[in-house]
Amino acid sequence: MPQNLLDFDLAGLTAWFGERGEKPFRARQVFHWIHQAGVTDFAQMTDIAKSLREKLQNEAVVQAPAINFAHLSADGTRKWLFDVGVGNGIETVFIPEDDRGTLCVSSQVGCALECTFCSTGRQGFNRNLTVAEIVGQLWVAQHSLKREPNRTASDHGAGEIAERPVTNVVMMGMGEPLANFENVVTALGVMLDDHAYGLSRRRVTVSTSGLVPAMDRLAERCPVALAVSLHAPNDALRDQIVPINRKYPLAELMAACRRYLVHAPRDFITFEYVMLAGVNDQPEHARQLIALTRDVPCKFNLIPFNPFPDSGYEKPRAEAMRVFREILQDAGYVVTTRKTRGDDIDAACGQLAGRVADRSGRVMKRVHREAA
């Protein structure tokens, strides 16, 4: 079976070439052709010896996930559904803004963590994505957007073709990135490599629900910006809505955040907080957050819940959001309220579901629970 070269970072590709008697600079050339030029046909890699091109055609492929469909939101947000085989699909979202282009990347087919307010978690879990499937989302987005006129949220008309449409990557799509640790770290290495996409560590963010041991490993192996899906200010509530908290409670999570900051490219952790009407959006919850995070340099990203069918939750009132935000701001915190982008194409936070052939049994267990 041919080797998919998208599965390699530069070190891995160099080793693979070495096993075939090829010099390291040849690996760098091919790496550049694949990631910077967007070329998948070895015959078009014209500065490479014909004999090597023929060898690659026999032994390798460059294969990103196939696009099943693409949607364009009224606000300029784009969503792709990628086919990753055996009835499974993953979703990837591109959010254009005047000063950046952010790609929201998936790391798993489904998610095993069962956060109760997340559409992905409702779909069950099938498998981890390969490196090629993770990097392939960026590869497709970068090179397909390069061929299109640059569009922003404020100007949907034609413009100059962007040299680098994707300036930021957030691992906030389907799945828990740190539960697919090795593949995610390898993919991050490709994203950061100057021979590939050359993204800054400050512009690549991994989001986790709180897998504490993996947070420590990420700090050692590939410290990028870190976002923690917090969503509750106390263990009793977080145990209910973010079940991984039962394994790694808040005291352990806050300690892991402090350790991560020793290595992080930014001097703060971003705490993501999906606000659920009547559940975690009251003033006392904001005050509990202040007490919880007083020893962790951080900012808060408040996210109004994005409804999906049968979620059981409602979007918070604007007044509740305002009061909550002001309590945090008055305590000296930087607080942002995430704009809802792409909700008309189900591309907003918490709405990504794709297609998941559940192998975990979680969907049927949930159906039986809800029917009881």
Swiss-Prot record:
Q: Which GO terms describe its cellular component?
A: cytoplasm
What broad class of enzyme is this? transferase
Q: Name one GO molecular function term.
A: rRNA (adenine(2503)-C2-)-methyltransferase activity
Residues where S-adenosyl-L-methionine binds: 175-176, 207, 229-231, 306
Enzyme Commission (EC) number: 2.1.1.192
List all disulphide bridges recorded for this chain: 104-349
The main location is: cytoplasm
Looking up InterPro entries in the UniProt record yields: Aldolase_TIM, Methyltransferase_A, RlmN_N, RNA_MTrfase_RlmN, rRNA_lsu_MTrfase_RlmN/Cfr, rSAM
Q: Where is the active site?
A: 91, 349
Single GO BP term:
tRNA methylation
Start and end of every Radical SAM core domain? 97-344
Q: What else is known?
A: Reaction proceeds by a ping-pong mechanism involving intermediate methylation of a conserved cysteine residue.
**What name does this protein carry?**
Dual-specificity RNA methyltransferase RlmN
